[in-house]
């Protein structure tokens, strides 16, 4: 039974990607738990810039493969060690183990994807490199066993609401 559950947890289904640079797609399966305007993350030097942020909580039953919300170039990847609070809590963004991907989209906008480890998830896997060119929906990594993904973006308007279910690579998060 454990073997079946592990196989289910680490599944990596193919997804139908829109492939339209005027939209951002969800980087993760899960529930939208926040849609807000915030300062950019200081970890990637954008704390003096305003962004919209969407947070997606992945429970242990969601697929944990993460994808890029847009086509573009990975300008930076930054790993921050940290604690392992429940990923749905606000303090998880600042205190939990996390990995930042700073992506320059095809329109020249900064898009930041943050993988945040949670109470059970204690391993972030990065499958991309700095300066790598990505297509919308490409796999960038995974977080094992329950976690969160935050997307910071500029110059797009949100299309999702808190409580909505998101599917990685398919759900349209925001529109140009």
Task: Write out the residue ranges for each language-model feature.
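Contiguous, well-folded functional domains in the mature portion of proteins
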Residues: 1-176
């Amino acid at each position: 039974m454990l073997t079946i559950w592990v196989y289910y947890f680490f599944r990596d289904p193919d997804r139908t990607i829109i492939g339209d640079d005027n939209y951002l797609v969800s980087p993760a399966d899960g529930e939208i738990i926040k849609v807000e305007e915030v300062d950019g993350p200081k970890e990637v030097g954008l704390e003096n810039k305003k962004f919209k942020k969407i947070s997606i909580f992945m429970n242990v039953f969601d697929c944990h493969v993460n994808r890029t919300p847009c086509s573009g170039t990975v300008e930076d990847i930054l790993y921050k060690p940290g604690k392992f609070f429940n990923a749905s809590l606000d303090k998880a963004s600042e205190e939990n183990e996390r990995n930042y991907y700073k992506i320059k989209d095809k329109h020249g906008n900064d898009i930041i994807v943050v993988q945040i480890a949670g109470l059970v998830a204690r391993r972030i896997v990065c499958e991309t490199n700095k300066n790598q060119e990505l297509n919308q929906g490409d796999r960038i990594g995974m977080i094992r066993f329950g976690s969160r993904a935050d997307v910071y973006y500029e110059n797009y308007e949100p299309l999702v609401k808190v409580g909505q279910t998101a599917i990685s690579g398919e759900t349209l998060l925001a529109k140009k």
